[in-house]
Amino acid sequence: MNNIKTKIFCDIAELKLIKKFNKKSIVKGFTTNPTLMKKAGAKDYKAYSKKILKICPDKPVSLEVFADDYNSMRSQALKINTWGKNVYVKIPVTN
């Protein structure tokens, strides 16, 4: 498994599962979104995101903006990006 060129990211928001999979060397990072966070019980997006970042400070974490218009998405993305050195911001694309 060490010669796999694909990086495996877990697409989850449950803190218990993030803690579990963060210990797995095969998992290279995490990605989540506002919908998954809400289902996991998040009430405050920033506070919940910071909990995720505290669990896995050394792996990439992709967080998604939840605004609907360009200016708000850009503003949110810039703010979210300051939450940690390992943060990657996702911008949803729709037709």
Annotated model-derived regions:
Residues 3-19, 23-27, 31-95:
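Active-site beta->alpha loop and helix N-cap motifs at the rims of alpha/beta catalytic domains
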